[in-house]
Amino acid sequence: MNFRNIDWDSLFSYSTIKIVRIRDKRLGILHFAFLIGIILYIIVGTIFLQKKYLVLESPIGSIRTSLMAPSVKPTDLPYCLKNGTDTSYDGYPNKPCQYWDEYLVLYPPSEESSMFITTRCTQETQSTVNGCNLSEPTCVYNTTSSSDFYIANVENFTILLDHTLSAPSLGIQYNGAQLNGQLLDTDGNPMSLPPPNIVGVKGSPDIMSLQGVLTAAGVESLDSQGLANKSRTIRDDGILILCFITYSNTYTYNTGNYHYTYQFKLVQNTKYKIVEPVFTKDVEDRYIFDRHGVRIIFIQTGQLGQFDFQTMLLTFVSGIGLVTAASLIVDIIATRIMPQRSRYQELKFQDSSINNTQKTPTNDHTPLLKDNEDTINENSYQNNSYEK
C-alpha cells in the first residue's frame, strides 16, 4: 500500500458549522413559531404547571390509631335478635347482640398501620377430649359450647387517627395535627361528615366514626350486601378498606403550605376474619373467638417538594435541546422540500480543503471564510438574498 497516494485530508476531514441566513419568510415564520412554542413549553408547561423547579421526595411516617365506644347504648337495634321476634332485617337473619367495649372490639389491641374492628363473633369453649394431654398424638379439642352474635352499635364507635410525616432529605417533619386536611370521597371530590366526625382541623386530632369511614368508602351501612357472599351482610362477613393518606405542599406555588387528604377505597370481592385463641388455666382449655369485621389498612403516600436551583437549571437545559431539534427540522425542510432546495444545499454544505503549505482556498465555487450574497427568487432564484 502506497501511503503517499492516500488523501489524508479527506480521511481526517472535519465538519464544522456554517451559518447561512436564508431570507425566506416561510422558513423564518416556521422557525419563529417553533421557538415561541418551545419558550411557552419551558416557562408555562414545565415551570409554572409541572413545577419542575422543585426537588421532590415521597414522605414516610407513622400512624397511631385508637378506638372508643359510644357513651349511649341503644336497645332497639334492627339487626339484633330479641326474644325470638324480628328474626330478619332487610332479608338477612338477625343474631343476638352483645355490648362490647373498645378493648374487646379492637383486635389486636395495637398495630402500626392498620386496625381491625369486630362486627360479628363466634365464641366457642373448647377442652381436650377427656382431659387428654397434647403430648398424645390422638388428643384433640372438643367444642363444648358455641354462640354467634353481633357487636351492638359498633358503627358508632369512633376512631382517633394520629399520623406523622417526614421527608429526611428535605428536612421536613410534621404531625398531622399541625396541618390542614380534607376528606375525599371515592371519586376524589371533597366531602364532609356530620359530628362527631372531625377531619382536617388544624390543632385538633382527626376523629371518625366507623359509619363515617364506611360512608367515605362508598358503603351505605354494615347491613348492606356482603362483597364475597351475597347471602350475608357486611356486618356478618367482614370487609377490607384501604385508607390513603396523601401529603402535598405542591398544590400551590407556596411550598410552605402543607396539606393532607384521606381517601378510603373499598377492596371488592373480599371479606375479613381473625381467629383469636384465649387460653384459661392451661392449654387443655381455651376459648376461640372467630371474629369477622372491618379491616382498615392505612397507606401514607404523596410528594413533598422544595425549590432547587440545579433542578431548575436542568429543566432549562433540557428545554434548550428542543431548539436544536427545531432548527434541524427547518433545515430539512429548506434543503429537502423547498423548491430552492438545490441552491440551499449549495449554500449550506461547502467542501473545502487547505493544504499544509499553501493556505489558500482550493474550492473554485465559493471562497472560504468570506461573506457572499446571493439573490434567489422562489421560482427563478432571483428574489431572496442569502448571507453566509
From Swiss-Prot:
Keywords: Ion channel, Ion transport, Ligand-gated ion channel, Membrane, Receptor, Transmembrane, Transmembrane helix, Transport, Vacuole. Residues 350-365, 377-388 have a biased composition (Polar residues). It is found in: Contractile vacuole membrane. One of its GO terms (biological process) is cellular hypotonic response. The keyword Acetylation does not apply. One of its GO terms (molecular function) is ATP binding. GO terms for cellular component: contractile vacuolar membrane. Pfam families: P2X_receptor. Residues 349-388 are annotated as: Disordered. Residues 1-28, 334-388 are cytoplasmic. Disruption phenotype: Response to extracellular ATP remains the same in p2xE null strains. Null cells are still capable of osmoregulation and do not show any noticeable differences in their sensitivity to hypotonic conditions. Quintuple p2xA/p2xB/p2xC/p2xD/p2xE null cells displayed slight delay in their osmoregulatory response, but are still capable of regulating their cell volume in water. Extracellular purinergic response to ATP persists in the quintuple null cells with no alteration in the kinetics of the response, but the magnitude of the response is lower. Residues 50-312 are lumenal. Belongs to the P2X receptor family. P2X receptors are ATP-gated ion channels that play a role in intracellular calcium signaling. Not required for the purinergic response to extracellular nucleotides. Not essential for osmoregulation. Inward currents evoked by intracellular ATP. ATP analog beta, gamma-imido-ATP is a weak partial agonist of p2xE. Exclusively selective for ATP over other nucleotides. Insensitive to copper and P2 receptor antagonists PPADS and suramin but strongly inhibited by sodium ions. More permeable to ammonium than either sodium or potassium ions and less permeable to choline. This is P2X receptor E. It comes from Dictyostelium discoideum (Social amoeba). The lineage of its organism: Eukaryota, Amoebozoa, Evosea, Eumycetozoa, Dictyostelia. The gene is p2xE.
